[in-house]
């Protein structure tokens, strides 16, 4: 993404100097011919009246950074009304976003042709309903786009995405390629094999490693889908905001918290070596975890409910010990550390594990659909 909020100026300069593929360490022999797509990071300017970048800036950026594919600068429309309201029935601000996305797409593809840009242009589709998105897609085809990037999907329910894709496929040419932008329903990909989708992007396997309340660790399910496990939360006592606030307010003792933190870590690592039972490990983990819950809420009934729920989820993780069944590079190298929700490094590693599991899941899904 060309969103300016993501990298420092120094990093941006290095990316433009070395090219995006090398910058992202995606330049190995196995990846040299793979797709490298750029977009405008439209979430970063969602509250602005217009996109943060002009078509000229975007074409220049994609060219300099060496992308193989580039999406026209769009402006996100979040709502998707299945009753298909007409143009004069939608809010002026929504219609303005639709029009600027279409106008940018025209200017963008004109510039790609004029400059003989070395990437394939992808036309961004935005709309307030399945019908308006289908009309936008046909408009992009008429401009000359052969690859469409479908936006605004992130907040939509799976059933609504189906309706959108049905409307799109009905309206556009069968050979027109489709990319799903920010497909947050990545675990439902098996439902979408019938729409001729060429590609999609999703951060959910990575993000869920450290942002989801319960599904932090992906695992192949014997039934063919995906299973999810809760990572075991043992934060650093003196770096966790909730715990530090509790210490400052005199509710917790720093020494006591650090002692419980170490006890939980030792128990979990001993469990991994077969030296401690799942039950005693669970007790040590929950003995520390209760302070996190107490630091978040003073509602005793809610605390009890949250602790019981977490105890069930952590108990399942310990019972199944999924990291022992996984032979990916991450789990083979770090073992039980991958399941500990603690520092940035561990959480990132778990994210990479999830990506590997998810990649395999997509491959299997595609093979089964043939």
Stretches found by the model and what they are:
Residues 115-285:
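Glycine-rich phosphate/ribose-binding loops and adjacent secondary-structure elements
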Residues 28-30, 115, 172, 320:
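A generic structural signal for short, solvent-exposed coil/turn residues
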Residues 71, 124, 329:
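Residues in well-ordered beta-strands of folded domains
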Residues 4-5, 42-44, 75-78, 128-130, ...:
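Short, solvent-exposed loop/turn segments at secondary-structure junctions
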Residues 16-18, 55-59, 89-91, 140-145, ...:
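Short, low-complexity, polar/charged sequence segments that are solvent-exposed and flexible
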Residues 32-33, 66, 117, 144, ...:
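Residue-level preference for short coil/turn positions at secondary-structure junctions
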Residues 214-370:
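C-terminal accessory extensions appended to soluble enzyme cores
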Residues 1-113, 269-312, 366-370:
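Non-catalytic, usually N-terminal nucleic-acid engagement modules in DNA/RNA processing proteins
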């Amino acid at each position: 993404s060309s969103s300016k909020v993501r990298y420092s100026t120094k990093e941006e300069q290095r990316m433009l100097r070395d090219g995006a593929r090398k910058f992202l360490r995606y330049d190995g022999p196995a990846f040299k011919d793979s797709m490298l797509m750029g977009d405008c990071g439209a979430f970063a300017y969602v509250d602005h009246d217009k996109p943060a970048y002009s078509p000229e800036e975007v074409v220049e950026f994609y060219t300099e950074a060496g992308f193989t594919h580039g999406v026209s600068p769009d402006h996100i429309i979040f709502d998707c009304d299945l009753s298909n309201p007409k143009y004069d029935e939608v809010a002026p601000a929504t219609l303005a976003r639709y029009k600027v996305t279409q106008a940018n797409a025209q200017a963008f593809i004109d510039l790609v042709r004029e400059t003989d840009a070395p990437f394939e242009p992808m036309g961004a589709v935005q709309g307030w309903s399945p019908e308006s998105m289908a009309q936008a897609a046909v408009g992009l085809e008429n401009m000359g786009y052969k690859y469409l990037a479908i936006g605004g999907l992130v907040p939509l329910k799976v059933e609504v995405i189906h309706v959108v894709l049905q409307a799109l496929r009905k309206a556009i040419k069968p050979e027109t390629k489709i990319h799903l932008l920010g497909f947050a329903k990545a675990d439902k990909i098996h439902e979408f094999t019938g729409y001729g989708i060429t590609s999609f992007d999703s951060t959910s396997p990575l993000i869920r490693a450290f942002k989801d309340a319960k599904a932090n660790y992906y695992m192949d399910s014997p039934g063919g889908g995906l299973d999810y496990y809760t990572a075991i939360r043992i934060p650093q006592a003196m770096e966790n905001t909730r715990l530090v606030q509790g210490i400052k307010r005199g509710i917790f003792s720093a020494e006591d918290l650090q002692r419980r933190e170490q006890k939980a870590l030792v128990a979990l690592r001993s469990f991994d070596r077969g030296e401690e039972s799942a039950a005693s490990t669970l007790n040590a983990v929950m003995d520390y975890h209760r302070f996190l819950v107490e630091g978040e809420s003073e509602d005793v009934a809610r605390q009890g409910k949250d602790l019981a729920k977490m105890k069930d989820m952590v108990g399942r993780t310990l019972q199944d010990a999924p990291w022992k069944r996984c032979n990916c590079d991450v789990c083979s190298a770090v073992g039980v550390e991958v399941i500990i929700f603690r520092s940035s490094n561990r959480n990132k590693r778990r994210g990479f594990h999830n990506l590997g599991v998810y990649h395999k899941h997509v491959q299997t899904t595609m093979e089964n659909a043939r």
